[in-house]
Curated annotation (Swiss-Prot):
This is Small ribosomal subunit protein uS8. SUPFAM superfamilies: Ribosomal protein S8. It comes from Parasynechococcus marenigrum (strain WH8102). GO terms for cellular component: ribonucleoprotein complex; ribosome. Transmembrane segments: none annotated.
Length: 133
């Protein structure tokens, strides 16, 4: 069965793996999922990204981060904002600050996928893909 929303699938796989305290999770690779994973790594939510497989069957293997003695997940919540049935676009001034700047909004812009901070710095708006905190 075809996956019609790979971004939601990615967020769900990461959310489920981190709730179960898994070290890694596998996600079907695409340009968009690679870009989102790079932003998550730059923002410190995941520790490592590697690829496994070849061609159409390529998967991203994400190493999740945990903190403290009790291994609390670094990612507390992931919410999909713009969905296939209802796209959400914001200009530079309308970009959201997640939890007053403690979280990250991942934005798809004309200059690529980036965090809300980077989009403000670049002076571009775009499609708000998800919130992570």
């Amino acid at each position: 069965m075809a996956n019609h929303d790979p971004i939601s699938d990615m967020l769900t796989r990461i959310r489920n793996a981190s709730e179960k305290r898994h070290e890694t999770t596998k996600i079907p690779a695409s340009r968009m999922t690679r870009s989102i994973a790079k932003v998550l790594q730059q923002e410190g939510f995941i520790s490592e990204i590697s690829e496994q497989g070849e061609g159409v069957r390529t998967e991203l293997v994400l190493s999740l981060k945990y903190s403290g003695k009790h291994r609390l997940p670094t990612i507390r919540s992931m919410q999909r904002v713009s969905k296939p049935g209802l796209r959400i676009y914001k200009n530079t001034r309308g970009l959201p600050k997640v939890l007053g700047g403690l979280g990250v909004a991942i934005i798809s812009t004309s200059k690529g996928v980036m965090s809300d901070r980077d989009a403000r710095r670049e002076g571009v708006g775009g499609e708000v893909l998800c919130y992570v905190y």
